[in-house]
Amino acid sequence: MPSSQSDIELASSTETTARGREVQLIINIAEPDPEFQPFALTDEASLLDAVPTPVSEISRRLDAYFRADLGLDLAIPLWRLVDRIKRLRPGWPDDLEPN
């Protein structure tokens, strides 16, 4: 059965879009090369879904950025990851921006 574009239904991206700045920052840390960054994300996508970077390297980069191991679950949806980081680091992302 041939499929058409009308058969494709993407999941919502409302929560991810609402946290766009923070989501993009996390993606930039996890995978600095724009060629390997996603062009679209849904609310169901985790950081592990979004970039091809190995988990150990993502963790290392996030630990270096935050200057601590926050014990983050990289398999949860990105928007939930952002909310988790904000609970652990209430001033983020502004408190870690370069001067």
Predicted features, each with a name:
Residues 1-99:
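Phosphopantetheine-dependent thiolation modules in NRPS/PKS and related acyl-activating systems
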